[in-house]
């Protein structure tokens, strides 16, 4: 190859390797900072308490809930607010007074907003939101979660709380991990580009890559703890039932022996 062409090729290769290393190391760095997810069973009820969930629903019949649209959730959609000034409480206030316009019903709305220390719920998970793709499946069948990005908010703690929330929603709604999607996944008709760079800090070049896979893997590990608790509880219940059955058998045996000796 001519020296100029070879030089350009090497630069492109170095750029690709640099992007891969950066995206891969971002998840690895966050994993080190957060620490590994424990592999011990966790009571789903205790997991719910850890979320520090506050319910502040949009008024029924108003704004994002002015039309009752029932939903059986099949997906979970992860967003980031891209709002440097609004915390979870500010977003709740905006939704509750219909300040965010758009979508099919005329008002934007989603189910949960997460910041470093709390989760606020805006919609029941049995109702459709307006957060992804107008009248597409992202709105019709998915629970929308927004991660805050305001100044002073700990991004890593927010992501971890979001991962725990997603795991809990997977558990209670029987949603498989492959149905946890980035907002990017749902194309928006009429937009260019149709796929939004969201949640932008979990994507590479505007698309899901190694960092997104790291995040989804962390959700899966939190979910596995909840399932493990069910399995451990089921095993313990089976052991207790077996012990009870054996005790009853022994008691019946001694009743027979006692009756026989008494007759003798």
Protein language model regions, located:
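Basic/polar, cationic surfaces and motifs that engage anionic cell-wall
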Residues: 16-53, 151-264
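Intrinsically disordered, low-complexity segments enriched in proline/serine/threonine
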Residues: 4-5, 61, 86, 195, ...
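Bacterial N-terminal signal peptides
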Residues: 4-14
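N-terminal catalytic cores of peptidoglycan-degrading enzymes
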Residues: 16-134, 138-139, 206-208
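Cell-envelope and extracellular/periplasmic
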Residues: 81-82, 125, 138, 143-152, ...
